[in-house]
């Protein structure tokens, strides 16, 4: 059992290269839920389809949320119930 057992993880920028790597690292673990938080609905849809083709069971652990890290309220809403966050967004330092 790991520290991530039965926990919820959120990946900001989850459809990018680093976000994909984080998702793949945790997908086949005892984590309860992985939230992908990103602005790009098309990339989320593509990722959802790839996960479904790979394994419907694993795909059921992933929840997709459209949002922008520059919008504090959307981040707060998405974080409700989250135990760990991986921040995989690039290029927002000036916005924060």
Task: Please annotate each region the language model reported.
Residues 10, 35, 65:
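Conserved Rossmann-like nucleotide-binding pocket used by diverse enzymes
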Residues 22-23, 44-52:
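Short, well-ordered amphipathic alpha-helices
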Residues 1-7:
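A short, basic/flexible loop-to-alpha-helix module at the beginning of a structural domain
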Residues 30-46:
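Conserved glycine-rich Rossmann-like NAD(P)H-binding loop of the short-chain dehydrogenase/reductase
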Residues 7-29:
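N-terminal Rossmann NAD(P)H-binding glycine-rich loop of SDR-like oxidoreductase domains
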């Amino acid at each position: 059992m790991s520290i991530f057992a039965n926990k919820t993880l959120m990946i900001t920028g989850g459809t990018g290269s680093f976000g994909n790597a984080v998702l793949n690292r945790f997908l086949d673990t005892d984590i309860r839920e992985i939230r992908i938080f990103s602005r790009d609905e098309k990339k989320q849809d593509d990722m959802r389809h790839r996960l479904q083709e790979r394994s419907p069971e694993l795909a059921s652990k992933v929840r997709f949320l459209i949002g922008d890290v520059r919008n504090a309220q959307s981040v707060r809403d998405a974080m409700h119930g989250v135990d760990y966050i991986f921040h995989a967004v690039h290029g927002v330092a000036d916005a924060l």
